[in-house]
Amino acid sequence: LSSAKASSYLTVLRLPQAARTFGAALVARFAYGIVFLALVLTVDRATGSYAVAGGVLAVFGLASSLLAPYRARLIDRHGVHRALLPMAAACAVLLALIAAVGWQSGASKAVLWVLGAAAGACAPPLGPFMRTLWRELVPDDEQLLQRAYSLDTVAEDLLYVVGPLLTGALTALAEPALAVLLSAMLLLGGTAVLATSPVAASFRGSAAPPPDTGGERAPTPPGRDPRWWVALLEPVLVTAGLGACMGAFNLLAVAFADRHGAAATVSWVSAALAVSSALGGLFYGAIRWRLSTRTRLPILTTFLGVFCVLSGQVTGMVGLGALAGAVGFLMAPTLTTAYLIAGEVDSESRGTEAGTWVNTAFNTGNAAGSAGIGLLLTPLPLAWCFAVTGAFVLLPAAVVALFRTARKNRVSTPGEIPQIAATLNPEGERP
């Protein structure tokens, strides 16, 4: 890392149209910080069944996560007004219908399941789209772009901290369905304002089909070229492992606290994760790194995995909280680095889709990690479970490191490097 003074975060927000665009995107993304807990509470109150509530949340989450890359491809292809805004409008309407159906007890379970799945299928990938816009907002300055991505990651994390608190307040004061309705309003309103931003409005969807080439073979679209997927493999593999690690770690923290007779203190472990992640993200963005993003990624994940393994060796909640803070301090930087690499892979034609695959990998890994470690908690000691949690990120880090070594040792024949190599730069740097 370099001691050169980095641009401040205020410099990022002072860029033309940056504050307006980022602010509108955050308002829309705040809906996702609210809606997950709001759906559980609303459906539970309407049906009297946690099983139904969990099922509705599951179909919403699965539809949202698994279909996100394809919705992102539509945005890359058709732009804001023909893809992003209609998605947000459809999702908002469906969430409003869930709020209306769930406002009173005795709601139809089947209707709630269908509405939940449909709303998830329409949920726009606002985070990846905003990260695509950052590359338009930020001039040709990699350090400033790193700052922007770090700020974006930290702000998104905070939305998922504040959102459940607001949902709880609305539930206590009124009805949980009001929180679902609020999320619909935030999603539609924020996306509508975002669409009026000049930088978002000018996003034309550069992944549109190429014009007629007069009988000549058109170039393979980057998203269909195998090399596109190879270049995206590293951030996707690492974030899948990171998601599994964090999903498992959160469950293990609860089990650890319960076995030490300190269940009430587990919230402090969660707080340590959240606060340290924000601090780590801000610190990471302030550093001018000499190492490339693809070199940093396995290093960050290796340290994070080691801290997870060490968490199984502590004997009290104070020690677990300290190591949770260390894990959290590296979480936002790891995600930021993965997002940067995804943007570097293909920022010109499928930047939103590339970033969305990273999101999908994290969310899928998170669910798998929680489920997997839950099965191991009974037969294995806690220390071994923490070791498995660390392995979730250590193994991808090792694979990525070996992959990079193999690519460096590969000798390319002069004149045979295709044009796409400029975009799929193995060092993750713009040509």
Model-identified regions with their sequence ranges:
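Helix-loop boundary and gating motifs at the non-cytosolic
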Residues: 3-65, 222, 226-271
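Helix-to-loop junctions at the C-terminal end of transmembrane segments
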Residues: 66-80, 171, 280-293, 377
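C-terminal ends and interior cores of transmembrane alpha-helices
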Residues: 89-106, 303-315
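Cytoplasmic helix-loop-helix junction between adjacent transmembrane helices
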Residues: 117-157
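A late C-terminal transmembrane helix in Major Facilitator Superfamily
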Residues: 349-380
